[in-house]
């Protein structure tokens, strides 16, 4: 007689398929909490720059971590600048100055020009 523990196939190691709804004791279905990430936006930019290139989930995790880190650094520096100047609002000027302080040389120049372009596009669309 076969052992019941060995007859059922073992789940694959590292399989990470999330169940969309978990079953509660009283029979009601509960939605799983959503994990926010920048993966959709990173993927869109990747396809603009290199249409034929893909990205692994590990690399996407690193990119997501990088974007979160840069966001926190810029937000923190902009907050400090607003506080130093006795302002209660973070404007595009604080963000721009924070970017200039945090990013080195040519990278800061490109970031500022892209940011200015994005703000101009946003204000013209309103």
Curated annotation (Swiss-Prot):
UniProt source species: Homo sapiens (Human)
Protein name (record): Histone H2B type 1-H
One Gene Ontology term from the biological process aspect of the record: nucleosome assembly
N6-methylated lysine sites (modified residues): 117
Crosslink (Glycyl lysine isopeptide (Lys-Gly) (interchain with G-Cter in ubiquitin)) position: 35, 121
Residues with PTM Omega-N-methylarginine: 87, 93
Post-translational modification: Monoubiquitination at Lys-35 (H2BK34Ub) by the MSL1/MSL2 dimer is required for histone H3 'Lys-4' (H3K4me) and 'Lys-79' (H3K79me) methylation and transcription activation at specific gene loci, such as HOXA9 and MEIS1 loci. Similarly, monoubiquitination at Lys-121 (H2BK120Ub) by the RNF20/40 complex gives a specific tag for epigenetic transcriptional activation and is also prerequisite for histone H3 'Lys-4' and 'Lys-79' methylation. It also functions cooperatively with the FACT dimer to stimulate elongation by RNA polymerase II.
Biased composition (Low complexity): 1-12
Family, as annotated: Belongs to the histone H2B family.
ADP-ribosylserine modified-residue sites: 7
Positions bearing PolyADP-ribosyl glutamic acid: 36
Residue positions where N-acetylproline is found in the record: 2
UniProt GO cellular component terms: cytosol; extracellular exosome; nucleoplasm; nucleosome; nucleus; protein-containing complex
This protein's record includes keyword Iron-sulfur: no
Keywords tagged on the record: Acetylation, ADP-ribosylation, Chromosome, DNA-binding, Glycoprotein, Hydroxylation, Isopeptide bond, Methylation, Nucleosome core, Nucleus, Phosphoprotein, Ubl conjugation
Residue positions, PTM N6-glutaryllysine: 17, 35, 44, 47, 109, 117, 121
UniProt modified residues of type Phosphoserine: 15, 37
Positions of modified residues (Dimethylated arginine): 80
PTM annotation (N6-lactoyllysine): residues: 6, 12, 16-17, 21, 24, 44, 86, 109, 117, 121
Chain positions found as N6,N6,N6-trimethyllysine: 86
């Amino acid at each position: 007689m076969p052992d019941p523990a060995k007859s059922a196939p073992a789940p694959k190691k590292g399989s990470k398929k999330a169940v969309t709804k978990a079953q509660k004791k009283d029979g009601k279905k509960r939605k799983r909490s959503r994990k926010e990430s920048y993966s959709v936006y990173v993927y869109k930019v990747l396809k603009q720059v290199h249409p034929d290139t893909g990205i692994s989930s590990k690399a996407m995790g690193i990119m997501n971590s990088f974007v979160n880190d840069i966001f926190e650094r810029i937000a923190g520096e902009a907050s400090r600048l607003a506080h130093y100047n006795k302002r209660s609002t973070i404007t595009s000027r604080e963000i721009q100055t924070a970017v200039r302080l945090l990013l080195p040389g040519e990278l800061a120049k490109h970031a500022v020009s892209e940011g200015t372009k994005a703000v101009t596009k946003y204000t013209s669309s309103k």
